[in-house]
Structure formats: structure tokens, C-alpha cells
Amino acid sequence: MRFRLALSLLSLALFAAPAAAQLEVDITGGIAQPMPIAIPGMPTPAVANTPAGDTAALGQRVADVVTNDLKNSGLFSPLPKSALQTVTHPQVTAPDYMFWTQSGAQALIQGFVQANGDGSLTVGCYLYDVLARTELTRQGFVVQPAQWRRAAHKCADLVYTRLTGEGPYFDSRVVYVSETGPKTNRIKRLAIMDQDGANHRFLTNGQTIVLTPRFAPNQQTITYMSYTNNRARVYVYDIGSGSQRLVVDQPNMTFAPRFSPDGRTIVFSMAVGGNTDIYRVSAGGGTPQRLTTSPGIDTGASYSPDGSKIVFESDRSGTQQLYVMNADGSNQNRISFGSGRYGSAAWSPRGDLIAFTKIGGGFNVGIMNIDGSGEKILTNGWQDEGPSWSPNGRVIMFFRTAQGSGKADLWSVDLTGVNERPVPTPLDGSDPAWGPLLP
């Protein structure tokens, strides 16, 4: 679905953005008090029925999604609905600043939902500094009714980016492994959903075990490992068509795949003669190229965002540790030297950090600089693992396994380690992979 800036919103008001004010959220050291923000329901100039509901109801639903997104970031404290004013369509561009000042809000989001003659919707999004009585930014989105949630996520992204200075991440998807059944006989299916758990659907039927799904940069392709005929093999799945194909037709076990940043290459591990090494192959298939040659197990490769380097895990030193090498396999260097073992490394899309699972008295998710310095543990569950980065590199999704039951759930945490929250899924979930920002 392509989004475009609306060309006629409240008499072209969206094209007259004022100069930026100074209201902002500082997220560099964590937030003691989230910013109070008001997000009233979005009015409509004329109630019209759409396949997704009438525009009046959609206005409230859009506001609810924006509220949920910003609240979940941990940086904002949306006012309760009981403290909100009912906004009329003319008030969208003329806020009642006196009311909102008395409400305690520092920032205000107002907008509208309008049905267009071609069957599309226009969703307008405006951000105001309440104390300075200034408009900070505005944008409009033209979408099909079925895509109204994406317009809401885009609005939340607009506000988040303007007030934090960080990149957006709400308009994105997650692919993961949905699990059900007893822990000794789990049924595992690929599933995909919006980052907030909405629009959930299953991609595979559970007849084979699937693990470690990873998005391609084009967001329409997933690579993953599947046990077929009792053999681990790497596949590629097309989300649009539902088709899947084998990446490498080898008699050996292949697993832990991941796309390169340009989507042209898949890096994976292959077990040959009792030794496991990292290989790369064209995403379209072909002859694999071996990148590591050390004794032991080398696996869990993850590219740097510029594609020049790869972080991976290896037990070549006697314990499971993290290493970084050039994308062609040269210049391999260990970067983890703390107590315990390290695995499931993931390079931040910002390029500045590496997330990992640390094993030592438990499983915990942490981050470090790309040279291994500045290690910081973010979680303290019984078994937390499998970190995956948000598109802006500020939030990490992982899965947490409960002691005893084997029940696994998806969670997210920010880089401060303070804002930890569960991610809703209809069944148990593991191996999350956060996809790029949608176009």
C-alpha cells in the first residue's frame, strides 16, 4: 500500500507548517516522567460509511491506535479519555489551548478522518505544543479504508520523530514462530502481524517445525529454517504468493539464515563432517561460499547495516562467544570477553550497537558497542533470548520462556532497560524478527 501526502486537507492547511518550537523528549538517558500528551478522537467533516466502518467511528479508532503506540514507547503518558475534550472538525486547526493547558497536557495531537469520492480515506494528523500554543508539524495520509491502521501508525511515527528526534518504527511488521501444544511436542508455525499485534495471520500450517524467520529488506520475503524429512534446511517464503522454495539443496543440515542488507545474499550455517561453519549464497540460489573454517560451531550470523561486516557466535575459544569479521570472511576477531557465554547476536540498523543473548546463571538480553565495549544487560527474566531490533534501533523485541511450563511469549524492551512490556500474540510465540519500516 503506497502512502502519499494528502493534497487537500482543510483548505491545504497541511502545506503551511509553522516553524519548529522547542518541545521535545530527551531519550538519551531514560525518562523519569513520560510527557503528558492529549489525543482526542478525530472528527470527520461528514459521516460516511466505508468498508472499515463509518468515518466517525474510524476517527476514534485511529486516535486509539496512536495512543497505544505512543504509550507503549514509554516516552509518553496519554491523558485518559475522561480528561479529553470532544473536538469538532473546525477545532482541528484551532485548538482550545486554555482547555488543554488546564488538562495538564504538554503536547496535543488532533486530526480528522474524511471519506473521499474515489473510496479512499484522508487521515490528517496535527501536533501542537500546548504551553507555547504553537503547531509543531502536520501531515496527511491517503489510504484505502482497510489500511486505516497504517495511517494511525504513520501519525504516531510523525509525532514520535518530531518530539524525540529519533527515526520512526510504529508502521512496521513482525514475523515470528507461533507455538502451541505441550513442551515435548510443540507445533510451530510462521506467523506475521503488525508490531502492535494487530492484523495477525499464520503463514505456514504447522506440519513441519520452523525456526529463526528473518525478513528480507523488501519486506515481502522471509528466510527461515524448517525441519523437512528430519533434516534442517533453509527456505525462502514469499508473503504475497504464499510460495516457498529451498535456498540450498545440500545433503547437510543448513540453518540460522539471514539476508544481507541489500537482499541479494543469504548468510547461513551448514554442518559438514561434524563441523559447523558460516556460508553465504545468492538469495536466488547457487553454490555456497564458505566464510569460516575454524573447528567447532560457527553460527548466528548478522550483517552490519552497510553490509561490510558480520557478527556471529563461535565456540572456537572453548566457550560460546561473539566475533566480528568482514563480509568476505576475512579479519575475524572476538569481541565478547565478559563472564558467561554469548549468542544470537543482532546488529542494530543504526550500526552503533550489537544486541545479544548472554548465558550465565540464566538467559538475558543485552547490548554492547560493535567493538564489544559498553556491555549492558537489559532484561532479567528466567530465559530471555532471540533479540531483534526495531527499524529505528531504539527498541528490541525478544522472547521469554517461562520456567517449568516451557511457555514462550514475545516481549520488547527499550535501550534503557526500563520500558519492558509483553507483545500480544494469540498463542505462544518465539523467534521474533522485526521487519523494516513499511513504505
Curated annotation (Swiss-Prot):
GO biological process: cell division; protein import
NCBIfam families, alphabetized: propeller_TolB
Compartments reported by the entry: Periplasm
GO cellular component term, pick one: periplasmic space
Database matches in Pfam families: PD40, TolB_N
Ligase keyword on record: no
Family membership noted in the UniProt record: Belongs to the TolB family.
Annotated gene: tolB
Top-level division of the source organism's lineage: Bacteria
Summary of the function given for this chain in its UniProt record: Part of the Tol-Pal system, which plays a role in outer membrane invagination during cell division and is important for maintaining outer membrane integrity.
InterPro entries tied to this protein: 6-blade_b-propeller_TolB-like, PD40, Tol-Pal_TolB, TolB_N
Name of the protein in question: Tol-Pal system protein TolB
Subunit structure, interactors included: The Tol-Pal system is composed of five core proteins: the inner membrane proteins TolA, TolQ and TolR, the periplasmic protein TolB and the outer membrane protein Pal. They form a network linking the inner and outer membranes and the peptidoglycan layer.
Residues annotated as signal peptide: 1-21
Keywords, in A-Z order: Cell cycle, Cell division, Periplasm, Signal
Species the sequence originates in: Rhizorhabdus wittichii (strain DSM 6014 / CCUG 31198 / JCM 15750 / NBRC 105917 / EY 4224 / RW1) (Sphingomonas wittichii)
